[in-house]
Amino acid sequence: MTRLEPGTVLDGIDRDGAARLIVGTSGSGKTEFALSVLMAGLRRYGGTQAVMAVSGRVAADALGNRVIRELGFSVQARPVTTLGAVAFRAISASREGTGLPSPRLLNGAEQDALLRQVMAVHLRHAVAGDDCGTCDLLCVYFAQDDWVKLIRDAGTGEMPGSAASAQSSLSQQGSDSPSPTSAGGSTSADRFTRGISDAFISQLRDMLARLDELGVGVHEEPRLLDAVTEDARLSVQWRLAFALRREYIAAQSAAYPGQYRLDASYLLVAGARVVHEAFAADHADDSGRPMRMEALGLPRLLVVDDVQDTTLAGMRFLEELGNAGVKLVLVGNPDESVQTFRGSYPEYLMRRSVEGRLKAKEEQLVGGSTGADQSHMTMADVIASRISLSIPSPEDEPLPPAERL
């Protein structure tokens, strides 16, 4: 099998316009090859027209520094970044071009505060006995009427308005305490919000993030609910998830009026929509495509390392980029995925990149394709290294080391 060269890959894309899926076994040098494709792209298309996306910011910074050192300079601040950052760049450029407020990410603390506000509303409903539709879903989901106790931290005291809280307030009447609501000047609303379990809020935030990463938008809700109508338990779970998401979005809009705030997990969904809307009418006339790409800050070449860890929303974003005219080189191995718990489906994504909208051409990466001499360790090498480092065998062996053969 002939070695795969970066220039050959780019020549093929320039010739037929199809994306390339580069698959390599573990240790075959996939990241090094992806980096070499980026370097070739920067030299061929220009310093701002090639970008590499990796799975994390730390890896992006390390690889980006290598690119800058090798080139001696960089027109881009971050030639290696994340797929979410590419989406954020497109969203920012789109909104700037139309005079809309620039996007700002919500951090974890801000998301938690909004979710606590959402749940505090239903805690107040439960205390007042004025349950809403979401309260009813919470009751069914937790399978008990007193579901409030399940989402509150132990030791936070009684909720304002509850019978025990009212009795405590009556017992304090006539005392010197100046606070009619709670100690330390906290209002009852504060106590509702702060008393909610951190673990519950964390799980709720993760659930909403998974919905975004799976690409489950508002328009998909009816179809998904119809698909689970025969499973009562699953139907309640989905209905509750969608109801809480709607309330979370409403709380976000109320908390940040006039701003465009979004979760990091929603970046790829919003990015795909922005690119789709910008190029939706370009099927017949491609003359304005380069200008639209430049207006959105899209590079001519995007190299994606560890593509097997991309979420479904990420794959849709890549498909929209491919439709917009971005040259794509996807590098990965489905057997090395480490993000399946966050909405990655490696085998499906690799197959979809070839059989789906991208119609990517698959090519195999042979170890050493980057030009570096890559040695293949034998079992003797492994044993020798373990002995030299005094690493004990993982197998139980009653004989002392001196008597072992």
Language-model features, listed with the residues they occupy:
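Conserved RecA-like helicase ATPase core segment
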Residues: 315-405
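Motif I (Walker A/P-loop) of helicase-class P-loop NTPases
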Residues: 31-39, 315
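Catalytic acidic motif of RecA-like/P-loop NTPases
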Residues: 58, 307-311, 335-336
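SF2 helicase catalytic motif II
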Residues: 300-311, 329
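Accessory N-terminal region flanking or inserted into the helicase ATPase core
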Residues: 1-26, 33, 141-303, 384-388, ...
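Alpha-helical scaffold elements adjacent to nucleotide-binding pockets in ATP/GTP-utilizing enzyme cores
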Residues: 37, 62-67, 86-90, 114-118, ...
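Conserved P-loop NTPase-based nucleic-acid remodeling module centered on helicase motor cores
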Residues: 47-206
